[in-house]
Amino acid sequence: MISISNISYYIGGRALYENASMFIKPDDKIGLIGLNGRGKSTLLKLIYGEMKVNEGSISKSRDCTIGFLNQDLLSFQSDDAILTVAMGAFKDAVDTQREIEKILHKLETEYSEDLVDKLTRLQEKFEHLDGYTMQAKAEEVLEGIGFTTKDLHRPLREFSGGWRMRVMLAKLLLEKPSLLMLDEPTNHLDLPSIEWVENYLRTYEGAVVIVSHDREFLNNVITKTVEVTQSQLISYEGNYSFYLEEKEMRENIQQNAFENQQAKIRQAERFIERFKAKATKARQVQSRIKAINRMELVEEVIDDTAAVNFKFKFNQPSGRHVVTLKDLSKAYGDLQILRHTNATIERGDKIALIGANGKGKSTLLRILSGTEPVEGDRTIGYNVIQGFYAQHQLEALHVDNEILEELKQAGSGKTEQELRGILGCFLFSDDDQYKKIKVLSGGEKSRVALAKTLISEANFLLLDEPTNHLDFISENILIQALQQYAGSFVVVSHNRFFISQIANKIWYIENHQIKEYPGTYDEFEYWKSKQRESEAETPPPAPKKVEAPAPQPVKASNPSTRKLEKELAQLEEKIEDSQKRQTALLETMARPEVYSKFDVLSAHQQDLDKLMGALNELNKRWEEIVIELDALKAKTE
């Protein structure tokens, strides 16, 4: 469908791409990944035709249509209702509907057979264009990504940039282009809408290319990963988790081959140096020189993801009770957020505050920080030192400061070397650290504000969407730091992987009350799934930490269960056989006579890629059957 062939693209002499190639098939679901600044968004613009390659070509099939969601759409404005904007996806049907309305209006005053014939043709065309269902489809998508029925008739201009992006996403999904390109689509979505979009994209009848730093989203949608690295496009036939495993294996094989080849070269060079002056050894010396020259050199693996870790430091631990909220109420006019609710944060609590947008998560964070007026009592504990990161913190940056200078003035007591290392963690290179705050993009300013918060000596952190402008490497650094953090924190985030790694408690707002689940996000999700499965009419008791139930003997078997159990057994045999073949293939590839010959190694690597792809599909089906069996067994208990 789209062929990207040997493209090169340069910015000021720096090669973003150099002889890079990839192919997009009609049903591909591709995750485009790589460090920030490597050219992921640029590639989407090149494919879209918004930018031109310096060398090479990007060719598209004649009937290929492209829809592109990028951050530039944040500025799109319209006085039309959001339902009207979304229905712009059905342009032909909308235009036909207007023509029908004009003819119906004419027929009220002047009847003619020609008008009736034209009306009939237009109505047939309208039906062919699914015109009678277009409004229902638009409503379904808009409500799926978080809009209420009342919202649908409000003008687009009344919504914030993030909500406008949702409308543009809905319009693109409804247009159903051959290729859907989405640049950071989850940045403006909440958890329920992210899950809805995942389900939609999984069954999308077309190709999808996604740039995202949400690994759960990628794992749940994509079937192919393309990494932008060292000016190249490297493909992996699986989702993000598959990519991580496969890349590590490829790099281990390549590094072993490199080291073995270098050892052979050094041995040959020593022989040449030792015997080059001896006439009796001239033939052997020349033979070794030719052998070195004929070698197709294996490149050393370059770890371009290496990063500095950092740890939080504070001198004074807080008291046992960090913040206590009693009989708290908060409303904006008629919009009630909280009503007579209570909550306590204790030392060591690592809380993820989750839920749909508009429920009051950011409001609650400001209440906890003391920056939002509220009815009721907020009591801060003994010796609590607070650090607060949110979007409004960007306004507190000194725009004439350089980035490094801004951190120095934060008074953390850290050395310049430590500060430079921390800035490196948050994607600022040595040269970038001397840029003025006023020339930075919104995302860069967010990272500076986050770094300032994290270098403080706070023993209580409040973080509002801290991963929004981070890549995978920086996110991992932040995860490790928060895991080791000895203080307490509350984090608002829609990044499921992030919160699954850092939180020991989950907060959510329901019926204007702060609800607490005393466990990890994965345990919370398990509890929620059990609640959904329950057919009990009475409301569930207050959530408690639950452990996965011990397996129970099945009381009775039925044909469906027996069929699934048989398929499961067959799958397990296939998985075991594939794993044995994988092990044997890896052992073959590790032999010197194989990895020293790059063409042979490459052929084995292709076999391994196919095997890993098949194994991935077997494992996915195995998981599906296990879930089906669990559901069937639950019904018989």
Regions found by a protein language model. Name each.
Residues 246-301:
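Intracellular alpha-helical coupling/juxtamembrane segments of multi-pass membrane proteins
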Residues 1-258, 307, 311-637:
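ABC ATP-binding cassette signature C-motif
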Residues 152, 280, 299-304, 376:
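Active-site phosphate-binding and catalytic loops of NTP-dependent enzymes
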